[in-house]
């Protein structure tokens, strides 16, 4: 397959309306999991001027103050005053959440936990490559870091005129499958009305972009598009409606890898849309970290109510040191990809999800309590089994 000559990925800030919705959904999930680790949660959020609307299906013994969780989340993002067009303390919160269908529950729940069926049919992908030190594609990795930097400078007061809503887009030129130079950066950020566009552009380039992207990636023809439409004072849910699950490419690999179509936020680990995508990243990252391949994409698929995956496929794009067939065999031997196995393997029944809902679910620092799918604790076992 021909390699891309250039590749572009985008990210959005925590104050982008779609990401607000994701964070609210995951904040509710976390609050429930604190009281009921085995709850069934599918929480969807819509945000628009002056209102947060919740819908979905939740079955739980937890008793949480949903409205308080919503308000705390919105205020924490930075929408805490009417001057910003949205105030978490005064916005309407409309709760339309119901219970999960018993027909779904009978297909998922089992007497033996290991036999837990998948919560739905579907296909999920995981990916890793040696482009960056976190084994992620460079465009999405740097796009996320730019948005984190924008939030850091906003929260610290270093650039006090910044507001919560922002977007980034990064284009790298590639040679022999590796990023070699920065072709273009697009960064649009909401701001106070007093700041001039000249001041804004200089600050964004010098204080946000240059500290994040390695100096050797810049070249004379690198293009900067900073707030290219000019003023960006009206933003967040006033400017656009936000919905849970509308940034699935931002959440994953920036388009560099395939996507099965299922969103993550607001879903408990019994939903393989989320848990199997996390497991796919865990598998692919350990394969690349172990040196079995320089690039790896895995696809897994499921049938509702069935524990074992209906398929496991691997693509190493010609970079493998062993056969793809051997890698699939090693995946089956070293990774339990049944829904319960994934939850146990990655310690997913814990309230850690809100922090995943902005700046990407992958390429973050992994630990035993957060982003567990980023750990590379299978490397030695894979090396030994592959004879490397």
Swiss-Prot record:
Cofactor binding note of this UniProt entry: Binds 2 divalent ions per subunit. Binds 1 potassium ion per subunit.
Keywords: ATP-binding, Cytoplasm, Magnesium, Metal-binding, Nucleotide-binding, One-carbon metabolism, Potassium, Transferase
Primary enzyme class: transferase
Pathway note: Amino-acid biosynthesis; S-adenosyl-L-methionine biosynthesis; S-adenosyl-L-methionine from L-methionine: step 1/1
Matching SUPFAM superfamilies: S-adenosylmethionine synthetase
Subunit and partners: Homotetramer; dimer of dimers.
Family of the protein in this entry: Belongs to the AdoMet synthase family.
Protein name: S-adenosylmethionine synthase
Lineage: Bacteria, Pseudomonadati, Pseudomonadota, Gammaproteobacteria, Moraxellales
